[in-house]
């Protein structure tokens, strides 16, 4: 293999690696967007659950049962 052929082969590999890095970067960005969206939804659902729990649970004093 001549020096020119080796250089061409290396340039091809670098180009393929750059393409792979760009694709992985895009996928990672999309996944972070999804994680952020899911995190916001989870926080909203948690807050809603706590609100409903407060509305549903009567204020019962914590006392020992009579048989204690």
Curated annotation (Swiss-Prot):
**InterPro entries, per database record:** SlyX
The protein's matches in NCBIfam families, at most eight in alphabetical order, are given as: PRK00736.1 (NF001962)
Q: Which organism is it from?
A: Brucella melitensis biotype 1 (strain ATCC 23456 / CCUG 17765 / NCTC 10094 / 16M)
Q: Which residues form the signal peptide?
A: none
Cystine pairings recorded for this chain: none
Q: What is this protein called?
A: Protein SlyX homolog
The family line of this record is: Belongs to the SlyX family.
Supply the Pfam families for this chain: SlyX
Query: What is the primary gene name for this protein?
Result: slyX
């Amino acid at each position: 293999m001549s020096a020119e052929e080796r250089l061409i082969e290396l340039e091809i590999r670098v180009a393929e690696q750059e393409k792979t890095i760009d694709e992985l970067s895009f996928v990672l960005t999309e996944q972070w967007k999804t994680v952020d969206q899911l995190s916001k939804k989870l926080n909203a659902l948690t807050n809603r659950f706590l609100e409903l729990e407060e509305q549903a649970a009567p204020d019962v004093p914590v006392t020992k049962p009579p048989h204690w």
